[in-house]
Each structure stands twice: as structure tokens, then as C-alpha cells.
Amino acid sequence: MKKAFILVNTGSPAELSAAACKTFLREFLSDPDVVPAPFFVRYPLARVIASKRAEAYLANLKKISRGGVPRLVEACAGLARKIAAMTGTETFAAHRYGAFPVAEAIRAARDSGARDFRFLPMFPQSASSTTFSVKREVFAHRREGEVFRFRENYFDDGAYISALAALFGRFGDRSLPTLASFHSVPVSQDGKTGYSAQCRKTAGLLASAAGLADVSVVWQSQMGGPLKWLGPSASAEIGRLSASGVDGVNVVCPGFACGCTETLVE
């Protein structure tokens, strides 16, 4: 049975345009795993926010993109090519929303003759708004006779931790405090998946592997509103360190294999 690897990221607009950003944001915010509200609330809210935020989102996307191609599309496709070259197994890049959707990647893999599909979400730590949403979408497309294997997480995988430590060795300064900044989620969602515990485990393993006395966990991209989000925020902690006289800090973001727009811009 022929095998195929499918990498799945959160998603990206298909192109650098306000229209593509609007479509992407509307699809993203319409997902009940992202906005846990009734459809009659979630759908119109997604349309309003997408219309208002499209231009600002495009401006942020342009900050991190190169050659007119959205950064996440380029990064995930490049990773797929490298994995295919390393393993000899055809590898496809897919996104939960926007460019190159999951259904399209599965169809391309089927057309190549694959019937054994190995899915790897680009999220080392499991959260309902990322891993769970991707898993639900993936298994909606399974056909009889096909094998679907899905990696839930890899927050404590030895190869992943070693890769993080190697990157720190290239760019980090052990004389400075180190912050591991993860994408925040509402506290109410964290309890369903153990996401924050997985993030803290990653940070602890990174500290051990890189020979650091400590790695502090901070959070970014809190959306505010009535929900309580995981904290402290990365910006607040950096401000606190600066006020205490610290003149430099290492920041590592181990939460997305290919990044996401908010993480990279912030």
C-alpha cells in the first residue's frame, strides 16, 4: 500500500490581497473549534471581523512574506519538499483554512496512488483550536479501505527537543534570560487538552537540552474580550525585565513548526 505524508498547518491566505485575507479570516473564525459560540453568533461575527481586519492582516502578512508569496505557504511547502527528499515518500503541504486545503492535499495524494496517509499537524502541542480542528477535518475525508494515521502532538519528542536546543545554540546567549513564548488560548479551552502543561514540558526539556538554568513560559496573541486567557503575556514580561535593568533577552517560539502570522509579527 503506497504511503504519503501530509503536513497540515493552520492556514494562510492564498495570495497577498485583501480579498484573500478576508476569505481566510472568515473561514478561520467560522470554525467552532476556534470560536466556541453558536452558529447564529459565530457566522455573522466572523463576517464582520473579517471585513474589518482584512487590510490590517494583509499589512502584517506582507511584513513576513517574501517574493509576493505568503510566508506560511512558502514555509510549509518548503518543509514538505525537504521531508520528501529525506524519506523518499511523497509529501504534501496542506492548510486547515485558505490556501491548499486538506481536501485538496488528500485528493492529490490519492491521485498519486497513495492509500496509507500519515498526517502531521504543524503544532507540537495540542490545542482544540489547532490540532483538534485539523483532526476533525482530516477524518471527514477518509474513505473505506484507506489508512489514516494522525500524530496528535510531539511536544516532548526527542528529535524535536534536540532541534530546538541546536537552534538555541546557534542564536541564543546563555548570559541572558530566556523566554519561551507560546500562542495563548482561553483558559476554558486549555482544560480540555492540557495545552499549557505540554508547553511547560517543552520549555523544561529545552532548558535541560540547551544547558539553561531556566526557561520562563510566556504567552502571546491574547485576543482579550470576556474570556480569561493564559498569561503572563510576553510583552508584559519583557517590559518587567527591562524595568528591572535587564538589557537583553532570548525569545524562542516553539509552538508552530512553520510559524503563524501573529507569532512571527509579534
Residue ranges and their predicted role:
Residues 1-266:
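Active-site-proximal alpha-helix that buttresses catalytic centers in soluble enzyme cores
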